[in-house]
């Protein structure tokens, strides 16, 4: 049994049912979680797919080697709603993906200023993808409206 499950069980046995009394409350002002023991073949997209089950992710930072660009096996993910972090920590800690048991926990992560260029590049690419997707959908709809 992992530590997080033990803490949750202890809270239940003690009758702690209020979110304000829970150990999760310490992280109430931070919507980031730490994701460790990742299979190094997983991408940001894979992480978003899995973790979107518990809320809307708004940021994911997959740690990569500066020289090779290869994953270092851990990431930070931010949810739109901090309460989603509780669901992810409680439900995905120990969950196996790619043959590895994930280590999920709350964190006080703060993005580094040096990542600003990275964020801007990712946002630019996502914006292009959204525009491309919207344009593709418009083209498909326009094509459907045309007579054969």
UniProtKB/Swiss-Prot annotation:
Pfam families in the cross-refs: RRM_1
Keywords: Cytoplasm, mRNA processing, mRNA splicing, Nucleus, RNA-binding, Spliceosome
KO phenotype (gene knockout): Cells have a slow growth phenotype that is exacerbated at 37 degrees Celsius. Deletion mutants have a significant pre-mRNA leakage at 25 degrees Celsius.
GO cellular component: cytoplasm; nucleus; precatalytic spliceosome; Prp19 complex; RES complex; spliceosomal complex; U2 snRNP
UniProt KW RNA-binding keyword: yes
Compartment list: Cytoplasm; Nucleus
InterPro entries from the UniProt entry: Nucleotide-bd_a/b_plait_sf, RBD_domain_sf, RNA_proc/Spliceosome_comp, RRM_dom, RRM_Ist3-like
Additional observations: Present with 922 molecules/cell in log phase SD medium.
Function in brief: Required for pre-mRNA splicing and spliceosome assembly. As part of the pre-mRNA retention and splicing (RES) complex, required for nuclear pre-mRNA retention and efficient splicing. Required for MER1-activated splicing.
Quaternary structure, from the entry: Component of the 45S U1.U2.U4/U6.U5 penta-snRNP particle, a subcomplex of the spliceosome. Belongs to the CWC complex (or CEF1-associated complex), a spliceosome sub-complex reminiscent of a late-stage spliceosome composed of the U2, U5 and U6 snRNAs and at least BUD13, BUD31, BRR2, CDC40, CEF1, CLF1, CUS1, CWC2, CWC15, CWC21, CWC22, CWC23, CWC24, CWC25, CWC27, ECM2, HSH155, IST3, ISY1, LEA1, MSL1, NTC20, PRP8, PRP9, PRP11, PRP19, PRP21, PRP22, PRP45, PRP46, SLU7, SMB1, SMD1, SMD2, SMD3, SMX2, SMX3, SNT309, SNU114, SPP2, SYF1, SYF2, RSE1 and YJU2.
UniProt name for this protein: U2 snRNP component IST3
Gene: IST3
